[in-house]
């Protein structure tokens, strides 16, 4: 999420850009992989504060070398059908994209890949971030059913997305999270990390790690569940002061969870700076000689800011020097 840069003023108009793709689903069924890529990216936009019916998509496809193998050609065809089906049911178009059919190295092929990127605009006042905001909040999950062939019920999904937008605009939710690859478990953990606010699950919560795309977790601003009358939802639990996640008789500290979450890629993409133990020499820039007076008494500096297509920050640079 970012505000749109403007010259000589301020704006509340912001842009949202999200993505969706699950390689395991794409490998199992390119049709479902693409369909749920669109669903995931759209739900993420709505969870942030956007509206599903004003979203525009751009799709990135990546497949193995197809050659003259009809089975291989069926993979991108099925993926495009899945993406088109989701777009048609949601009433939103893809206005761009890029494809590559060279995802083969020797005997290794990429999984059938269609990544959906969703773009929308939103007033910054309506933007909601995913981290829990306070303790003793009720946390619910707004759920969308699956129909035959494991395709999401798009009519229910659109109804749920409209409800989330309404709740956000009425300031009735404090935080939101659109379910992704890791399901409820991932959502609650990441929502707890931000402000180190714990969570206690209610009894009987199942399918913690099922990627139920289309479901959205909401931290409610009040305990009034009548806001969700007529909708399919479950109460997951409540936020706590203890910095841990409790489910049944198990309690896991947020510190332990966060370290487990980060350690996989820490050697490749370090997030912690290395302490410098060597003594750093103090360098003195004070001149010992006589100060020289410039022949120019009035300085009028000029700043040259080169800009190129596809780059940004020129407005920020200009503002910094003004």
Q: Where are each of the predicted segments found?
A:
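Short glycine-rich or small-residue beta-strand-to-loop segments that form or flank ligand, phosphate
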Residues: 17-18, 58-64, 302-307
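Short hydrophobic/aromatic beta-strand micro-patches
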Residues: 217-221
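Disordered, low-complexity tails and leader-like regions
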Residues: 66, 319-322
């Amino acid at each position: 999420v970012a505000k749109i840069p403007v010259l000589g003023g301020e704006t509340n108009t912001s842009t949202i850009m999200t993505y969706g793709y699950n390689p395991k689903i794409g490998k199992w069924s390119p049709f479902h992989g693409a369909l749920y890529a669109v669903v995931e990216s759209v739900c993420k936009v709505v969870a942030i504060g956007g509206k599903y019916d004003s979203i525009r998509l751009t799709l990135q496809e990546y497949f193995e070398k197809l050659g003259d193998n009809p089975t291989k050609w069926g993979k991108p065809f099925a993926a495009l059908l899945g993406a088109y089906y989701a777009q048609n049911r949601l009433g939103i178009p893809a206005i761009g994209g890029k494809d590559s059919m060279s995802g083969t190295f020797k005997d290794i092929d990429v999984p059938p890949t269609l990544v959906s990127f969703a773009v929308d605009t939103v007033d910054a006042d309506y933007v909601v971030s995913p981290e829990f905001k306070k303790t003793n909040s009720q946390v619910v999950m707004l759920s969308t059913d699956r129909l035959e062939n494991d395709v999401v019920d798009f009519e229910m999904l659109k109804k749920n997305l409209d409800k989330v937008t309404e709740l956000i605009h009425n300031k009735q939710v404090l935080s939101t999270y659109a379910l992704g690859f890791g399901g409820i478990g991932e959502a609650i953990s990441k929502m707890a990390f931000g402000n180190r606010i714990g969570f206690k699950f209610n009894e009987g919560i199942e399918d913690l790690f099922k990627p139920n795309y289309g479901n959205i977790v909401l931290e409610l601003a009040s305990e009034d569940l009548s806001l969700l009358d007529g909708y399919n939802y479950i109460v997951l639990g409540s936020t706590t002061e203890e910095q841990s996640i409790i489910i049944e008789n198990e309690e896991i500290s947020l510190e332990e969870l966060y370290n487990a979450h980060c350690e996989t890629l820490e050697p490749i993409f370090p997030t912690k700076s290395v302490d410098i133990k060597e003594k750093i020499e103090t360098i003195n820039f004070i001149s010992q000689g006589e100060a020289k007076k410039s022949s120019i008494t009035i300085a009028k500096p000029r700043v040259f800011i080169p800009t190129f297509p596809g780059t940004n920050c020129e407005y920020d640079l200009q503002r910094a020097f003004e």
